[in-house]
Amino acid sequence: MWVATQDLPRSAAHPFYTRLNQILDAADFDRYAEALCQRFYADDVGRPGLAPGRYFRLLLLGYFEGLDSERGIAWRAEDSLSIRSFLGLELHEGPPDHSTVSRTRRLIDLETHQAMFTWVLHRLADAGLVKGKTIGIDATTLEANAALRSIVRRDTGETYDEFLTRLAQASGIETPTREDLARIDRKRKHKGSNDDWTHPHDPDAKITKMKDGRTHLAHKAEHAVDLETGAVVAVTVQDADEGDTTTSIETLIDAAEKIETVVPDGDGLEEVVGDKGYHSNQALVDLEAVGVRSYVSEPDRGRRNWTKNPKARDAVYRNRRRIRGARGKGLLRQRGERLERPFAHLYETGRMRRVHLRGHDNILKRVLLHAGALNLGLLMRQLIGIGTPRSLQDRAIALLRCIWSLIRLPDTLWDAISRLYRPSTSLGDVLTLRDDRRLDFSVPTAFTTGC
């Protein structure tokens, strides 16, 4: 059956994605992506693959649409005509299948995803949204796509139930019941050690206590954020059982390199702001050694003996003086605002709190483009006042409510005035206005600042 072109379904392109595409096209986004990914594609062998520019746009959609899986991204691309326009799909072209997106992600290496993240930082630096002087650092846990019941012993390869059964039989219980296994498990110490247990399909996932108190296999995502603008300048994914003072080394090195790349005329990284988890003697000494001032909250460790470590004493005391000053207090307050916001946008509304991929490299590829989309949202907010498509929808709803309130205003006023002037029961009385009667504006209206 033939269908005329004018009879095919059409939709007005989403204004947010239209403006975003204009920004990407003006900076040769597709040409840059194709040049980076050329070595991963054969010239004339096999089926045509997913275009690099289209692939990276699909990953950007994960943040803008709040989609946590590649399957969900593919479904959304198939469902929306405006997103098809953003992806550059013609009417006769079908959107890529989720397996095509996954295969392309595995094909393109991590360094290329890092380069695309840096490309976005260049666009922010051109707009003055990357200063690079003061960096805040913080981390969060991402729930792994792996179940605790599937972990195995590192030495023997036994599953958890097989290991408990062997312990029960060694203690004299030949056929242990579930209650016996549970009792033996409760009495054991160090039952959740990452030194003894691993997941066979995701060795990078570590047994970790989540922020809500649950114990789960997880990964650790760490951000470095420009505290002057809120731009994410570096993202790393590391072992969830590593301490903050250990993982911060890789993140700060990555942040310093990216700042030097995108702001070559600047002074580079000068200040680091962190919470109590990043406070240690060696961490403060290392920061001073490279000429970086620290503003790190200090936990209460009581009286300390500095006789054998005067260098650490000086670093700790200088950090303490800085955080007690006016600038230090201001930076620590700013850290709570500028650092927590990306975590909320990326992992709560961005739906990446639980990952569907396995392995640090695969997860980091998604998180890098997720953070890149957040940075593009900052640029869009500077240019048009909104940072996500949903923000535009909220403004449209507020505007419609204001219009509806204005339409209803005459009826509302008439009803109020009618209640003020009420006929007297006596025929000789005239209409009177009682002193205690007031205009009643209790009718629900939608006067908001969204007007």
Model features per residue range: what roles?
Residues 239-245, 329-427, 434-436, 445-451:
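Basic, amphipathic alpha-helical segments enriched in Lys/Arg and hydrophobic/aromatic residues
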Residues 1-12:
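Generic start-of-chain signal for non-secretory N-termini
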Residues 51, 75-78, 87-292, 297-299, ...:
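Polybasic low-complexity intrinsically disordered regions
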Residues 47-49, 110, 362:
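Conserved, non-catalytic sequence blocks in retroelement Pol enzymes and Pol-derived host proteins
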Residues 67-77:
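Short, charged amphipathic recognition helices of the HTH superfamily
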Residues 10-60, 65:
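Basic, short loop/linker segments at the boundary and entry of helix-turn-helix/winged-helix-like folds
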Residues 171-174, 277-361, 387, 451:
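Helix-centered, glycine/charged polyanion-binding patches within enzymatic domains
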Residues 39-43, 55-62, 232-238, 268, ...:
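Glycine- and acidic
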